[in-house]
Curated annotation (Swiss-Prot):
Keywords: Cytoplasm, Exosome. Its main location: cytoplasm. Signal peptide: none annotated. This is Exosome complex component Rrp42. GO terms for cellular component: cytoplasmic exosome (RNase complex). GO terms for molecular function: mRNA 3'-UTR AU-rich region binding. Belongs to the RNase PH family. Rrp42 subfamily. It holds the Pfam family RNase_PH_C. The keyword Repressor does not apply.
Amino acid sequence: MSEDVIAEIKRDYIYSLANQGDRADGRKFDEFRAISVETGVINKAEGSARVKIGDSQVVVGVKIQPGEPFPDTPDSGVIITNLELVPLASPTFESGPPREDAIELARVVDRGVRESGAIDLSKLCIESGQKVWMVFIDVHVLDHDGNLMDAASLGAIAALKATKIPNSKFGLGEDVKLPLNDVPIGVTAVNIGGAIMLDPSLDEESVAPCKLTVITNKEGAISGMQKSGVGTLTPDQINHIIRLAKEKANVLREKLEGIQ
C-alpha cells in the first residue's frame, strides 16, 4: 500500500472521528495530553527546563552574558532565541541550515516573550549604551509528536523562571533572579472538519489545513498569534480559539508555579 493511500486513510479516519465528536486518542476537543515540566536539567546553563506534552519533548537552555545593547535601546537588555530540530526527533528532520518551520517556531517563542514584556529588559542594563545582559534562549526539540509550539513556549518561560543572572561570574556582585514581569503561555488549536481541537497530535497536525497559536499573558491580553497552513478560519472560530487559549493558559501556568 502506497504512502499516499495510507495518508488518505488516516485523514478520513481522523475526520470521521471529528464528525462524531471524538479524537483518535480519546481526548476531548479542548483537552491537552499529559504535561510534565522539569527545571535544572542543564547544569552549565543559567536556567533550563525539559517539557513533555504527550510524546513531544523539548529542552530549553538559557545563557546570559554581557554584550553591547542595540543602538535604539541603549539601556535595555537583549533577547536572542534559537531553535534546533534535532534529527533524532523525527524522520523528517535533517541536519543542516535551519528549516522554515524551525525559524517559525523560534520567532513565535521569541515574540511571546518579547511582546508580553515577560523579561524586564530595563533591569538588564549594566552600563548605559555600553554593556547590557544578553539573554540567549536555546530550544532543542528532542521528540516530535505534534504541538511543538506550545511545548517550546512553555519550556522557554519555565527555563526563564529558573534563570539567575551570573553577576559573580563577571565580577559584578551576587547572582540574582532574572527579573520577570509576566508568564506568557501559548495554546495551539487546529480546525479539522469544523471541529476546533487543542494540543494537536502529529497525526492531527498532518491532516489539518491550518493551525492557530495564541499567546496570552497573566491578564489574558494577547501578546502573540501565529497561523500556519493554507486553510482558513472563520471569525467565530478564531474567537472560539482565543477564548479557549485564555482558559487553558491559566491551567498551563499552574504547571510553572513553584519554579524558583
